[in-house]
Amino acid sequence: MNHPAARLDARLAPRLAERRQAGLYRCAEALEDYDGATAVRSDGQRCTVFCGNDYLGLAADPRPARALAEHARRQGSGAGAAHLVTGHRPEHEALEAELAAFTGREAALLFSTGYMANLGVVTTLVRRGQAVAEDRLNHASLIDAVRLAGGRPRRYRHADPTHLAQRLDDRAQLVVTDGVFSMDGDVAPLPELAAAAEATGAALVVDDAHGLGVIGPEGGGSVPATGCAPERVPVLVGTLGKAFGTFGAFVAGSRTLIDALRQWARPYIYTTAPPPAQAAAALEAVRIARAEGWRREHLQALIARFRSGARQLGLPVPQPAGPRTPIQPVLVGPSATATAWSAELDRRGLRVAAIRPPTVPAGTARLRVSLTACHSEEDVDRLLEALAAAARQAPPTLEAPS
């Protein structure tokens, strides 16, 4: 037991056992042969996937894959260095230019992940002790970013501009919010949040990971979808691994903002640049997403079908106002109930992950249904039937808010 690894394991084992006992233990299963809507499980059975983020079905589209293969042959499998050393390539510059144009901003900067992009933004713009207002349901990366920056978080009630205004004063530097909230699928009231921020001189930062490509004209995201002018959101964060089906993230804004991030954003400076071939694939995916509006139209039709069916069946699915997103949570309450529902759906060949604490508050465990443009009406109907069966077997104890 004197071995360092054994001592470390001895400290970790009780924590892992406690997590298993609480029904919160997590594990990953390798799925194969993903085609945008279905995949093959580890037991060899094909299942329909309703819990991914590939909203437009571009992860399995052959065109970004061809771009990736072509540029990998020309540029190799990796960048070989950080952007500011020798890792920056023409593919990165082309993608940044496309993203700036797509979002209506002067410039954009690539990051390896959305988590790193949020860390880079907040740690660059906030100094230790400065106040930052944040929605209480923000993504973990935004919450962690404020902590790591040494900022003083001022949380306001979810999507509540009035409470935000009460929490703000002229010492607050930033207001940070998700554009589309990843666990509830609702959209932030951006014009009202912007007005509250502007009243005290704070800058509004929007992480639109789940909105870009999906809602708004040409998939422009939550900013145009809510009627908010781009200049009222000085900092926009987006990801490339969700609606665009590839990998990576970016920040879009003024040239001055992007220059500042290039100088001081440690997650950008101290990491290897994304593979150039990956940037080429993302560029192709963004162009496809902008051009092929039928993907969003079909997706919206599926969302409407699911919401209508859930309402008719009495399923606990929230029906919030505002733009409709592919994230449709089915609220059940206890973690054990969510796990039982997920297992029943899995038995029927439908993969929907149970979302449990600490990802969501205690007592609000759910199945987070995510629809994609590759699903069919028949897929949605089969999902609704399975959810109704799961509800009969293990009734939910949490009613969905209206």
Swiss-Prot record:
GO terms for biological process: biotin biosynthetic process. InterPro entries: Aminotrans_II_pyridoxalP_BS (IPR001917), Aminotransferase_I/II_large (IPR004839), AON_synthase_class-II (IPR050087), AONS_Archaea/Proteobacteria (IPR004723), AONS_Proteobacteria (IPR022834), PyrdxlP-dep_Trfase (IPR015424), PyrdxlP-dep_Trfase_major (IPR015421), PyrdxlP-dep_Trfase_small (IPR015422). Its cofactor is pyridoxal 5'-phosphate. One of its GO terms (molecular function) is pyridoxal phosphate binding. Pyridoxal 5'-phosphate binds at residues 114-115, 182, 210, 239. It comes from the Bacteria. Substrate binds at residues 26, 139, 359. Pathway: Cofactor biosynthesis; biotin biosynthesis. Gene3D superfamilies: Aspartate Aminotransferase, domain 1, Type I PLP-dependent aspartate aminotransferase-like (Major domain). It catalyses: 6-carboxyhexanoyl-[ACP] + L-alanine + H(+) = (8S)-8-amino-7-oxononanoate + holo-[ACP] + CO2. Its EC number is 2.3.1.47. The modification N6-(pyridoxal phosphate)lysine is found at residue 242. Keywords: Biotin biosynthesis, Pyridoxal phosphate, Transferase. HAMAP family: BioF_aminotrans_2. Homodimer. Belongs to the class-II pyridoxal-phosphate-dependent aminotransferase family. BioF subfamily. PANTHER family: 8-AMINO-7-OXONONANOATE SYNTHASE (PTHR13693:SF100), CLASS II AMINOTRANSFERASE/8-AMINO-7-OXONONANOATE SYNTHASE (PTHR13693). Catalyzes the decarboxylative condensation of pimeloyl-[acyl-carrier protein] and L-alanine to produce 8-amino-7-oxononanoate (AON), [acyl-carrier protein], and carbon dioxide. This is 8-amino-7-oxononanoate synthase.
